[in-house]
Structures are given as C-alpha cells and as structure tokens.
C-alpha cells in the first residue's frame, strides 16, 4: 500500500486509484474497514523502525498539528504527528508518533474548568512521552521541538525523563519573581548575532535575516487559573532558559522575525544560544511534511471517505509515505550518508542505476555525484525524474514526489522485462 500511495501521490489519494482495478479496490476497502487494523498499530510500526535508527544520534522530535478535514457542522479532524530529525545534519529519521482528534467550535469556553487530562492540549505532552522512546532506544540526546501552540505549563512541569524541551513562547507568562517573561530580554545586553535564511511564506518572500541574540535563566510560575486539585500536583515554578532572537533591520514592508524560545537545555554562551535557534529552525521540516501530505502532494484534505475510521487509516498511511518523500529530500546532498534501504527495497538498486545512467549528461553537473547504493544516489535520480535539471536550485518535496511517481511507473515496466 505504501508504494501505491507514493505512486498516486501527485494525483491525490483515492481508494479506486490505489486499487487500480476492482479486485484491488475491494482489498484496499477491506483493509481500511478491518477493525483489527488500527491507526495506532500502523504508527507504532513506523515508530519502531525510527527508534532502530536513533542510536547514538542527537534527535529532534518535532511535533505540530494540522487540519486534515475541514469543519463540517463545527467539527473538523486534526492530525498531530511527531517526526524525528537528526539535529546535526537535518536528516529525516522517520515518524515517531501520530494521532487524530476532532476540533469542535465553542470548546474554548470552559477550558479552564477541565482537568489537563481531559484537554486536547494533552497531546503535546503525549508527543513528548513518545519521543522519550527514542532515548530508551539509545539516542544520545532527544530534544522535543514545538511551536507556540505547545507552550503549556504541564509540558515543562511533567517533562518525561530522557528528553529536553524547546518551545517557542506563546504567552507572556508570569515569572516567580513577579515580572513578566517578555520583558526579560529588554533588560539584557545583546549577546551576539547570527544570520539565518527565512523560507518564503504567504505574503513574504524568502530572505536572509540578521538576528540579535539574548538569553537568560527564567523561572516560570505556575498559572493561577489552574484548578486547585490538579495544580497541587504541579510544581510552583519551573526553571528554564529563555533565548530571544530578534531580527535587526527587517524589510520596510515586512514583520521582523522575533522568536522567544524556552528550553530545558543549558545555555552558557552565545554559541549555545545559536545552537538552540538552529534547533528551532529545523521545525520547518514538519511544515514541509504537511505541504507534501496536503494540497501540493497527497491532497488528503480532498479525501471522500465519510467514516472517520477508514479516513484516519488512509491519512496515516499517506503520512508514512510523505515521510519517505521528505527523507529523500533531506538526503539529496548525501550529508547523512544513509543507505538505499532506508526508503527502497534492495531489488530497486539495479533499476535506479540503469535510470541514472540514462539521465546523466556529459558535464560534471549532469553526473550523479553520489555513491551507488546510497539514498542520496536515489534522491538524485528521483529529482531528475521529477523535472530538476541539476543546474538551478535544489529539488524540494513536490519535485521528489513527482520523481517517485515516475519511478514507480518505470519500476512496473522494469519488473515485467523478463516476463
């Protein structure tokens, strides 16, 4: 099913397309409706494979939420995945965990009266708990990376053993000394600067930004509105480090990049602060995953499955396939020196080598520069199949997906060559 999802990715996911014929369609439908097949089992299988590749590595466990089904009668379906990324070279290691939940209009009312265990925000702590499995599997370090929606007191106070936290501050929290979080950096001298490339976003072209860095220890106070019974189990404060990165001289028609990052990592000098900002910037990886999963790739938002169970299984399978696409993108330069078997069957090697020989030109830039048997070698082949010329820019997820679609079509003919 994984291969067929990749093959159909650029056309959107449909059971009829996946099945290819009536018999195949029935098999896929039975799989999706089989109560013995669960999303948790599918995700757990992918997670075991990811854990097997984590030993000795500093892993960023990046988590975020995206809507995969728009609200109907005020109810929408959201997906919350956790992916593992190598903190040093940016290699996508794989999927750690994923879950679905419904978002209902009006739920924000009364949220302060609910226990944390009953809130949807519990998913952020659950994601960190699954990330701790990477540490148990031998990862040298695990850092959970979250955007502002993950700025939850319990996320820090109940942090699982074996992981560090890195969260972009989403609210001006009260500190134990009575001051406010956002005012802290204003009292500090600039510790140093760094330049970062900001990717394009809606209404904002890509640019290079110069960031002024400041950092200091902070002690976050327990929120006053927590229910008494639940709050009694939480510490009165949590000691963290605040790292602020504020853009200097932003474009006149743009908004300055301004990140306030809370972390459990020790930050002793400006080099440590730059490292923390670098970890946070890797969060863009999960945005690329969502882009591949949705309109620009598998188009899961257009799925016509009416029942939640089969719908979630099909989205989960698409998520696993989209993660494979992202692995190829991140290994296009061969930095991680990953083997072909990370994303391909061993028997695919001969086909990839034959296609590479056919695609290579006479100039050095038209030659596949990567060793045979490596994932980078396959990434170059798929990028060329997806329309990349080898001269301009670097191939992204959509180009790689188009290349995978073509490769699976070629592979079908390759497998029939001796029939």
PLM-predicted stretches and their roles:
Residues 1-62, 66, 70-78, 83-419:
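Single, function-defining residue in the core of a domain
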């Amino acid at each position: 099913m994984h291969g067929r999802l990749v093959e159909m990715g650029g056309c959107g996911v449909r059971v009829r397309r996946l099945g290819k014929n009536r018999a195949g369609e029935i098999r896929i439908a039975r799989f999706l409706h089989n109560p013995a097949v669960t999303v948790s089992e599918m995700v757990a299988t992918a997670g075991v494979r990811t854990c097997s590749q984590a030993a000795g590595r500093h892993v960023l466990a990046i988590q975020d939420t995206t809507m995969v089904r728009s609200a109907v009668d005020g109810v929408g379906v959201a997906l919350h995945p956790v992916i593992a990324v190598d903190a040093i070279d940016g290699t996508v290691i794989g999927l750690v965990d994923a879950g679905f939940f419904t978002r209902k209009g009006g739920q924000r009312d009364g949220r302060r009266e609910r226990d944390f265990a009953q809130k949807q925000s519990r998913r952020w702590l659950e994601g960190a708990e699954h990330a701790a499995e990477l540490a148990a599997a031998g990862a040298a370090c695990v850092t959970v990376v979250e955007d502002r929606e993950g700025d939850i007191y319990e996320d820090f106070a109940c942090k699982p053993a074996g992981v560090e936290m890195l969260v972009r501050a989403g609210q001006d929290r009260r500190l134990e000394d009575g001051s406010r979080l956002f005012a802290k950096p204003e009292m500090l001298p600039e510790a140093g600067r760094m330049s970062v490339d900001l990717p394009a976003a809606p209404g904002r072209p890509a640019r290079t930004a110069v960031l002024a860095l400041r950092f200091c220890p902070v002690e976050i106070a327990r929120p006053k509105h927590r229910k008494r019974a639940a709050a009694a189990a939480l510490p009165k404060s949590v000691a963290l480090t605040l790292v602020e990165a504020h853009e200097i001289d932003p474009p006149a028609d743009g908004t300055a990049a301004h990140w306030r990052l809370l972390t459990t990592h020790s930050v002793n000098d400006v080099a440590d602060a730059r490292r923390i900002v670098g970890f946070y910037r890797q969060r863009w990886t999960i945005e690329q995953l969502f882009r591949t999963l949705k309109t620009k790739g598998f188009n899961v938002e257009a799925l016509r499955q009416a029942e939640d169970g089969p719908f979630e299984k099909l989205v989960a399978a698409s998520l696993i396939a989209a993660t494979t696409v992202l692995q190829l993108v991140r290994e296009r330069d061969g930095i991680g020196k990953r083997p072909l078997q990370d994303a391909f069957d061993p028997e695919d090697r001969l086909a990839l080598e034959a296609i590479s020989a056919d695609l290579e030109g006479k100039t050095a830039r038209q030659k596949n520069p990567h060793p045979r048997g490596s994932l980078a070698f396959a990434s170059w082949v798929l990028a060329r199949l997806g329309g990349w010329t080898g001269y301009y820019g670097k191939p992204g997820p959509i180009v790689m997906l188009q290349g995978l679609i073509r490769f699976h079509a070629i592979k079908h003919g390759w497998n029939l060559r001796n029939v």
